[in-house]
């Protein structure tokens, strides 16, 4: 892995960090440039100061005793110029018109959590087409070994967060595959242009050069998008019917019906008939006849036509994909003239007649069950209908089984920090019981019926002999009891370990259990702010703990701050955040969590930290429609505003934006003093001031101050005193955040300070984080790499495990939680327990109530027992190299 990294010499030795007495930070760290990176000079002793000075001159920055190491060019955003420019070429390959295998398959994004629209894979021997790319598509495909690198085209049935939330991550992943990177054609209605404009703020333009928008058309005829020897794919634009008082269509209203038509299968060539009856000798003329061309007989003065020597052709199958999001769309669908040629009746059951074999309905159940939609479905008498829209069916069986298995194991070991996931309620309702239909391999009888879609359900198109429904790939359902039985069989002593953990909440037993060395090292002095703290004060739910891109076991960054009846906050919002909320709280509980969001804070513009934001905002706007409420405040880096402004042309996001640099301590002080908002990135005296040269950006101080006042009001209403952003070292405009609770009265009536929480975002360890974390109650710090991979941490401006802990130790933090692990550590990262006495590692869906914070480090050794048989690196982690390439694309 080290050998493949750009800018680093093959034989880099492990970095040696020198102690510094003059700095509050325990490490002596200095900036470096990848172009001149040399460990021998970078970490030279004081006797080789001349070489350090030469290095500083090259970097254009000064070094001091309290400087720190980071990748300067990456932090400034200039490292992109060091990378080889990629020209993402479209794949070209020889097609196979016969296509021995062809099928349509349901990819179950959104099937258990209803957070996105389902995706559909149209598979051929040499081509792959995907319809819709909702959030979680990559994660689902990784788990089920569906190679995204084989995808040729992506079609969107609508352009919105529900159908395209996973598209940015998909494009970034494909851009990082292979030597040059790959690109696909992305098709969608005219609204696709708005989405492309929005994504330009954080996705390289090269990754989007093959986006294709279409319609609306002046004619009712289908718009042909793809027409080759394999398949013809056409689009029919669907606009909602509006009443006269309605203002008309708006962006995001357009929907598409996709018509996929396979070519006919030619009849069998009758060699004997051609030779003996029509006098055509074997040779090139046989091929011409089979390709549909007439030829002259070699023995008679006649013209021989293909129909003379070939059996009857079989019509090619037809598949429709219908996304009808509202009943207004359904009314338009019912009256579409362009679909009339595809309708069938009982009188048309002639052998060899062409008809629609399968319709995959992406429409929600509220629409498909309406009288209008049901009447439209009855126009297809020979068609298999697959209902793939949102239905409350099989809800208790998660589609991401790998991560669900880990969640169930953690819940058994420590339910206090890992409550039962929302998809495994204690009692199942009738509508969550699995479909009793047997999983026979395939059935082609009685196509004129409707069935509910399931994960990986197929409709076989070819071979003709097995055309029809195929359930052979549907995964077996997974229940929590099965996972627990499996766990007890593998690790019998885990039952005793679970009982031991329960005793941490037993006050009387806690007096004796401290005798264990590990536990005795934990800080047992409870901070005043946690004295008699109520369980409904604050709970931290870590929704995603992985870096770069979603994996089988870890989703990307998101932290939900639950203030219970007062409201909630969200810190970062990577792809799939809504799905994770629904896995934690259940469908209805997650909706309530989204409703009560008052502020969303985003650390930086990298895609793994914000591409789930639009889906959350759009859903909140929908849930609160018609209810008196205030817009949610989004605090983020300035480039994020460009994305949100462009995206709002598609969906109503109902939000108010505030730049992170307007929420620094200096800006808040300016608000209090009646001055102007501060726009500088680093505080006076920071060593970073000599490194970063930021051009001033004009700010409308009146609007900033107004938004700051609104944020201050929101904080007061939810029981918080401060939300303060501080700059960190990762990429341009990267931030961490401090959140402070309001004062409260303790058990003896005294006013005591509220708790203080700090989140680092993505960052190298730096003095700004140490200062911001001073005496914090809890620090959540990224720990992307294990200690042995310091070179990679430096090159990518991330932290190692020990570096993150050292930040917390230098700041006298009470508890440290490590997160944002490289996906090379699929289940549990490499850790050294010797220096983690007040630290714990995070897992997806981990819930830390402030009343339990004192117990947190005590459970860490038990995690190692739980995962003792697991490999440190996972063979199926979609290649660690992909993690690195994705990071480069960002």
Curated annotation (Swiss-Prot):
A biological process from GO: tRNA 3'-end processing
EC top class, as a word: hydrolase
Transit peptide feature, positions: 1-44
Enzyme Commission designation: 3.1.26.11
Pfam families cross-referenced by the UniProt entry: Lactamase_B_4 (PF13691)
Catalytic activity of the protein: Endonucleolytic cleavage of RNA, removing extra 3' nucleotides from tRNA precursor, generating 3' termini of tRNAs. A 3'-hydroxy group is left at the tRNA terminus and a 5'-phosphoryl group is left at the trailer molecule
Result of knocking out the encoding gene: No visible phenotype due to the redundancy with TRZ4. Trz3 and trz4 double mutants are lethal.
Compartments reported by the entry: Mitochondrion; Nucleus
Keywords assigned: Calcium, Endonuclease, Hydrolase, Magnesium, Manganese, Metal-binding, Mitochondrion, Nuclease, Nucleus, Transit peptide, tRNA processing, Zinc
Protein's UniProt keywords contain Chloroplast: no
Gene Ontology CC entries for this record: mitochondrion; nucleus
Keyword Flavoprotein recorded: no
Primary localization class, coarse: mitochondrion
Domain of life: Eukaryota
Disordered as annotated region, ranges: 46-67
Cofactor(s) required, per the database record: Zn(2+); Ca(2+); Mn(2+); Mg(2+)
Function: Zinc phosphodiesterase, which displays tRNA 3'-processing endonuclease activity. Involved in tRNA maturation, by removing a 3'-trailer from precursor tRNA. Can process the mitochondrial tRNA-like structures (t-elements). Involved in the processing of small nucleolar RNAs (snoRNAs).
Family label: Belongs to the RNase Z family.
PANTHER family in the cross-refs: TRNASE Z TRZ3, MITOCHONDRIAL (PTHR12553:SF74), ZINC PHOSPHODIESTERASE ELAC PROTEIN 2 (PTHR12553)
The protein's name: tRNase Z TRZ3, mitochondrial
Organism field: Arabidopsis thaliana (Mouse-ear cress)
Gene: TRZ3
